[in-house]
Amino acid sequence: MAAAGPRPTALISFRSPDEGVPALHLAFGAARQTLRAMVPAEVVPLLARVDALARAGAWCVGYLHYEASAAFDAAFDAHAPSDATRPLAAFAVYDGPLAGADADAAWGASADVAVEWSGGPKREAFNGAIAEILRAIADGELYQVNATAPLLGTLRGDALALFAALRRAQPNAYAAYLDLGQGLPDDRFLSVSPELFFDWRDGRLLARPMKGTAPRGADAADDAAQAEFLRSAPKERAENLMIVDLLRNDLSRIAEPHSVQVPRLFHTEAWPTVWQMSSDVVARPRPGIALADVFGALFPCGSITGAPKVQAMRLIKRIEAEPRGVYCGAIGVVQPGGAATFNVPIRTLALRDDGATTHVRCGIGSGITADATAAGEWDEWRHKRAFVDRASQAFELLETLRLEQGVVEEAAAHLERMAGAARHFGFAPPAAAAARTLAAVVAAHPRGTWRVRLLADRAGDARAEAFELAPSPPLVRVQVARTPLIGADGEFVRFKTTRRAHYDAFAPRDPELFDTLLWNERGELTEFTRGNVALRLDGQWLTPALRCGLLPGVARARLLREGRLREAVIHKHDLARADGLAFFNSLRGWVDARCVLAPRGG
């Protein structure tokens, strides 16, 4: 639970937006007042009031909904708000941030928390929206549209604890927690956005539109290849350049002549679940430009509309059934003196209470250009939701080892794999604690054969469980999954953790069956739920390639090094011509298998 102290109404943890600009890590308690704009006509006066208060020495923290765009241009078409009792924009005004123990307490949430996700886009509707966008692009209506679809769920636990989990899952972001209702109807917002909307200080305005995405790789080599693909892919570069041109045009409306520049183009950056591409656009605002003028020129950010902006927003309204809310709007802080930093609230959750339940909404989107495909955009949507999957439920790192007659087999390889998972998920290094824990297990079980479950938590602490292991039968009966494993390329497949619901769903119901053979959405075999798979085809033992989506098993790596296995892409239909099938892992070794249920399709 959070430590005792005043419950924060706002938390801001913004990375440094530019060289020489300090990062922000601020907690705020009760506001001295909260400014709210309920309709578009009230938004510009609200921003003028925020600007004046900040220049007089106040801290102002707040947000604008995407639907506040009508305040700046009547041609910006968006849905009406879903609830007229909640503001389009709101800013809390503070004398200063919390300090000392109160600040520490505000950031101290650590309770277990979970989000139960129950709804997302339907594939048919998603494909239909992409098709409509591509038709509009082909007809010359526009060049690019940022299409979004929400993920819906319910929160079990405390919102501050969820925000802490989100920050662990998406570190080094422009993160914000806002609870500005102060007794009036309002949602709570939890943002861990990687995208800077703008930073304005000392006569310089910096915008950093983010467009272009690639998934993180299955291993270091694949990860480097994904980064290089993103840097050089024509679709991703075109997507980014269109928005850079849009932002240059937007900034020119308030900039001194010839001051708009692009000092950095097509910069790629690694985030926990994806690679992202961004570019920098800078300008010197003309004298007399105020905060409302900056929003008037830039809002909503072109990266989350498309180009041209007016036409893109009209199409967005047609294909998206509901208002976006704060998602794709702006969240930020205006400091005493007027320096302002705002994010684009992607990777952002909106929480709404109905008395008994806290409903969670998370928008996820991508830029659609002429060469987009529905399948590719669907994959991108899934990759982008991975950050919230990681934060939605606590988990531990897991290794399963064979302890036989006082010796842990391939212990070093297992510990190395656990260390790699810790680096990926941002856990404290578990190596020392894991080694001590294994030594204690060995001392307690010097005889016999044991299955050891070694677990490590986020703090790097380790624990272990040991169970007697019966000999494996010489031949096991297995089945083939009736449906594909959705998201076989996800991080909870590539790394071994206690998050195994995606495997448990395929566990055989028949106790006579040993395991289930899985396959991905392309019809490629991947692995069993508890081990790797090998097929003998044309006299050669083959195992699925990592890019098909599977755990890089310790035994698998050894057999590949020894030349006893070769990697390949193996399809379901290859089972019919295989003259050998095996289950294997470092716990049970090599076990011959026989498929008793034929796959459907493929």
Q: What do the predicted segments below correspond to?
A:
Residues 240, 277, 376-380, 384-602:
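Helix-start/capping segments and mature chain N-termini
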Residues 1-397, 404, 520:
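Extended alpha-helical targeting/anchoring segments
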